[in-house]
Amino acid sequence: MADGQLPFPCSYPSRLRRDPFRDSPLSSRLLDDGFGMDPFPDDLTAPWPEWALPRLSSAWPGTLRSGMVPRGPPATARFGVPAEGRSPPPFPGEPWKVCVNVHSFKPEELMVKTKDGYVEVSGKHEEKQQEGGIVSKNFTKKIQLPAEVDPATVFASLSPEGLLIIEAPQVPPYSPFGESSFNNELPQDNQEVTCS
């Protein structure tokens, strides 16, 4: 075994350089499967900017990258439940309203305040255990106020079921100086009267 000899013959037939796509019997069918997607939805003979710009713009409703359809709004937005930390947009004329489940807290353990365009609801609850330990529950929830709501008008009430209802009326839309929905001028009669 001296001089680097091995007790068994060892040959490496795959040591030669080979192309795995050309040598394999499956290589001709490797790229045939479209995986359930259209190969290319548009004509690729167009110059680059003409076919790429629609795919790169956010407003383009077509397919993206080999037939992938752009995602719609999340399921929470489709079913009227706002995303976490966001308040639902108010409808014109209706007050803004959010409910927070605080059934395990007493009213004196809750605090509601507005700060920097957010409503912050926090609660702290402590229980003494018989074994000498203390169990405490703390939570803080921040909800962004819509632009149509004045933070000074926010008020909260606690329902018997343990729901904290936070409401605020919408600020009426303001019109620029000089523009209004009513006309200050008196109506003019089309009849001409000559005084003699």
Swiss-Prot record:
SUPFAM superfamilies associated with the record: HSP20-like chaperones
Alphabetically ordered keywords of this record: Chaperone, Cytoplasm, Methylation, Nucleus, Phosphoprotein, Stress response
GO BP, sorted A to Z: cellular response to unfolded protein; positive regulation of aggrephagy
One Pfam family hit: HSP20
Modified residues (Asymmetric dimethylarginine): 71, 78
Listed PROSITE patterns: SHSP
GO MF entry, a single one: protein homodimerization activity
Principal location: cytoplasm
Modified sites of kind Phosphoserine: 24, 57, 87
Localization, UniProt: Cytoplasm; Nucleus
Induction: By progesterone.
Keyword Cytoplasm: yes
Source organism, top-level taxon: Eukaryota
Family note: Belongs to the small heat shock protein (HSP20) family.
Subunit and partners: Monomer. Forms a ternary complex with BAG3 and HSPA1A. Component of the chaperone-assisted selective autophagy (CASA) complex consisting of BAG3, HSPA8/HSC70, HSPB8 and STUB1/CHIP. Interacts with HSPB1. Interacts with DNAJB6. Interacts with BAG3.
Record's function text: Involved in the chaperone-assisted selective autophagy (CASA), a crucial process for protein quality control, particularly in mechanical strained cells and tissues such as muscle. Displays temperature-dependent chaperone activity.
Name of the featured protein: Heat shock protein beta-8
Gene that produces this protein: Hspb8
